[in-house]
């Protein structure tokens, strides 16, 4: 049975609002609006470089910023900003109905909160397995440890990290442009294909031998 590995944030759900809201809380009174913030982030600029390049009134050291970020980014208050992309539920439902096994792999910290969010979205029965690195290991190491599912036709994600993971494991890598990296940034990691949104996965070469209709 063919299977697909999906990333979560930026791939199946819109989580940009959550990240920008937390950034604005921790680094107040900057010249950055959401568009400018994501322009920098999608170009691959990390928080340390970004914070050092702008005016703000935060007294946090970068190490303190990182600690607070990890403490709050998956709090219920901020997770409530997340919403599924309008096309994600129908895609997952259709793939499942075609006997394609769906796996979710995310670098989040708390498996129980991932499970709760999937239940909120009505997605808890779509995935054969949900894997959470808990920030304790890389996605690559997690997949090696548990074993890559049989007949994986693609791994889809919104970051260079996802593409690199797929490439190193010999999985067909698909980058998606709804998330945290721009097309120019994703191309640096040599994806097999780049798509505008996750529902376009059915039009990739990964599906050329799959009877999807």
Regions found by a protein language model. Give the residues of each.
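Asp-based, Mg2+/Mn2+-dependent phosphohydrolase catalytic module
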Residues: 1-2, 112-213
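Short, flexible active-site-adjacent loop segments at beta-strand->alpha-helix junctions, enriched
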Residues: 69, 108, 159
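N-terminal helical cap/lid subdomain that shapes the substrate entry/recognition surface
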Residues: 2-86, 90
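Short, contiguous strand/loop micro-motifs
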Residues: 10, 37-38, 77-79, 101-104, ...
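Well-ordered alpha-helical segments embedded in enzymatic catalytic cores
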Residues: 87-91, 142-145
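Substrate-recognition element of Asp-dependent hydrolases with the DxDx(T/V) motif
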Residues: 23, 88-118, 133
